[in-house]
Amino acid sequence: MILSKKNNAVIILILLILSEVILAGTTGKISGKVTDAATGEPLPSVNIVVVGTTMGTSTDVNGNYVLLNIPAGKYTLKFSMIGYADFIVEDVRVNIDLTTKVNAYLKEEVIQGEDVVVVAERPIVRKDVSNSQMNLAGESISSLPVQNVVEVLKLQAGIESGRDGIIVRGGSANQTVFMVDGLSQNDERSNIPYATVSLSAIKEVQIQTGGFNAEYGNLRSGLINVITKEGNSSVYSGTINFHYSPPAAKHFGNSVYDPYSYFNRPYLDPDVMWTGTNNGAWDSYTQRQYPQFEGWNAVSEATLKDDDPTNDLTPSAAKRIYEWQHRRQGEITKPDFIIDVGFGGPVPFVSEYLGNLRFYTSYYQQRDMFVFPLSRDSYSETQFRTKLNADISKSLKLVVSGLYGEINSVSPYNWNVPTGSVLKTTYDVANLLNSSSGNAILYMPGYFSPSSIYRTMFAVKLTHILSPKAFYDIKLEHFTNRYSTYQMELRDTTKKYQPVPGYFTDEAPYGYWGYSVSGIDGMIMGGWMNLGRDQSVNSTTSLKFDIINQLNLSNQLKAGAEFVYNDYNINAGTYSPSMNTWTREQVYQLFPYRLSAYVQDKLEFEGFIMNLGLRAEYSDPNTEWFQLSDFDKLYSAGYGNSLEKSAAKEKVKGKLYLSPRLGVSHPITDNSKLYFNYGHFLSEPASSYRFRIQRESNGLVTYIGNPYLKLERTVAYELGYSQNLYDQFLLNIAAYYKDVLDQPGWVYYQNLNSTVQYYKATNNNYADIRGFEITLSKVWGKWVRGFINYTYDVRTSGYFGLTKYFEDPVEQRDYLRLNPYQSKPHPQPYARANLQLFTPDNFGPAISGMYPLANITLNILADWKAGAYTTFNPHNIPGVVDNVQWVDWYNIDLRFSKDFDFEDFNLQLYVDVTNVLNTKFLSQAGFSDIYDYNDYLESLNFSWEEGVEHGNDKIGDYRPDGVPYDPLEPNPNNDPEIAKRNEERKKNKSYIDMPNIKSMTFLNPRKITLGIKLDF
């Protein structure tokens, strides 16, 4: 709910008195009861120590105890009391924000020094969890055939991988918060998570897909909380992990640079290159598969007939110049690799004098080669992260964290203003080719601008333990993101190259040249290139305070507040010295802030656990904004550049929101529970929706933000059931519903004479998401572990009101004939399965003290997703929507590893294989244009078609290699011979008109990665 300004100050003051900051959970707690093993009587004043730490407590008069603020991880507890043998519990697992129950049963001491040692039982069903969440230990992640955190996340139910990051239960990437040690790693320019963490540094990952407690804000779909390792105060330890993938093509088929590829064959095939594609030996089908070319004879004749005697060329010379201008070869010759290193321990020389000062540092470097090179040949990323811990006293703990990250890639924007995204995946790059500039993209390195992102973070956290039952944290964080999308090095225009005798030229198409230049075949070699520029810097500073008080054994109160201050210094645009039409800018510097506070109460009883919270969020754009009519002339060319000076302004008022949160867990038995959660979740719109001002070089305003936007809202419900099966398996079933409101969208405005044409942001988008998930997992076992999950959801989205407003009533009436857009709900269920097969320690025969068959792991991952629906309506029949479906997608990956245990270190050798079956799935990157795409669809035989064209094809079906194109014959008279031939054609799919860019039609063939990992 949104509150009026009258109540704002009062409510904020009340919440701040009750609490001080939102602190993302990084710790858990241990509780239990200590009794006499013989009589069952509770034992008071029993000392409890977390071995190897300074943490401890004692039991109360009823034998109960609580240990708060325990960092996530595995521990050993020691219970001691005079007259009783020490009771030691090993392998106690503490998870983020959860309660671990450990009861102790002390025996009277018979033999002095005799200890009772037990291993903690891990509950299959966590009774105090009232939402869908998964806690993954670092050692569990390390055995999976994955190379980064995102690949781990997308294995979970309800999570998919999207263009900008993970999609949680249908919510876009900017609806998820990614935290490391309680520090947000979301880039607040777009709210997209920066989800890079060295796997060697991970201690635990908690994944929540709904039901977030009131302490968490600026999120609506998912919460990822990564806890990194802490250095030991007495010994050094570390991990070195190296992945290596030999150079190999990232597509099936011949190289896109091959002489017979889509872009080259018309100019290099002897059958047509001299006389032209329409006059040579090609049949009509082959002609449709390639660009038209008049032939080198015609090119030569044109040079001889013009008035320039310096460009006269023979046909052979013209062909040679083509080869010179297309000399770039982009086959992959470098390997993909990942270097992942972690190391920690006491800080040398000063550790014991500075509160056992210790450190853990990680280094991560990755390179993924592009499927073909652009202004850079790969996506590369580097990250350095360090954490210092110090025990200033028994009650004061200090943590200092720092991060430096760097991404080097290519901007995906052609004539659009860059907004921070870069190219990464094989499909992202391959999909660039299906445009009229495809050959320029392949052969001119500067078509897309090189782009880098530099990230730095510094944070300090102080924990003060007030008593065994209360503590608070103070945290200060500063996170900066610097963007650099820039102009390449200028072209050397010296005509010093002689591709044919007497014909001199420069180094084109290499180097930057801002003026129009065309190749001998018409290929762009200047002007339309390297347009994107971005020198933006945005920084986020947050101050947090959080307090936790265990009021009694059943009631834990948590409260906090947070102040977040953003500095958006946006300076992006496109630039061309020769084309003002494509010179535009997006420049602003603003300082919005938000303040939030919450109260969270956790009630824990034997058959009922409840998390009850209330969160207040105040968002202030902290700016003045323009007061203009919808069709004001200040939006038009010649006026827009003076908008800031000429337009009337007013101060934008902040808004206050209240968000209730409720989570209930009801353990039915020791082995089963029901849970339910409900909450209102809010997030700020991306900065481009709130503050963007984009103008053409002539002043025409084309986009303008709206700082009056409401926060985006999701009201979510979840009902779930968990069951322990045979003390081996956990079954979890969850159903959810998300009502999504106030998402921003762009609305178009145009005046009578079209001098005003711009887009303005408004809260006009909604969505309705509902679904269910089933997960069956086996998380422990010496021989077999694994999981299988299934997700089914239905998503509907649309717009309130109109998306276009015309001052001309005729144009407005024409537009109103269209219905407001609403997507049709077509579910795309998906499933994942993981099977881990182990051989235990000391398994098999020993050879010289070694066990060759021990510690071998085979880890198999399988994915499946139902095909998406789309529309194929070549005859524009009214009402035909989403009438065709893509084929289902599936994939299998595996890792095979062998561990060697030595006295001081562990060595693991492994091999990862992705796309084990080398399965082909048709990619839209293979279509040269919309006509090529339609030709392919026309050739398929869908279930709703009649006659000879009736069939059961889906988009993605393809003609196998080696099968020539042979279309179906019309058979109006049901001729049995024609029917027989058509049956054979349908059997081998010869009738399918395949995409023209064959090299990009099938991507991501089988890939083998070799790895070595050293733990010491």
Predicted features and spans:
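Periplasm-facing N-terminal accessory domains of Gram-negative outer-membrane beta-barrel systems
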Residues: L23-V119, I124
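Solvent-exposed loop segments that connect transmembrane elements
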Residues: Y267, Q289-E323, S411-F448, M488-L531, ...
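Membrane-embedded beta-barrel scaffold of Gram-negative outer-membrane proteins
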Residues: D473-E477, P667, K673-Y675, G679, ...
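Gram-negative outer-membrane beta-barrel transporters
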Residues: Y736-D739, V756-Y869
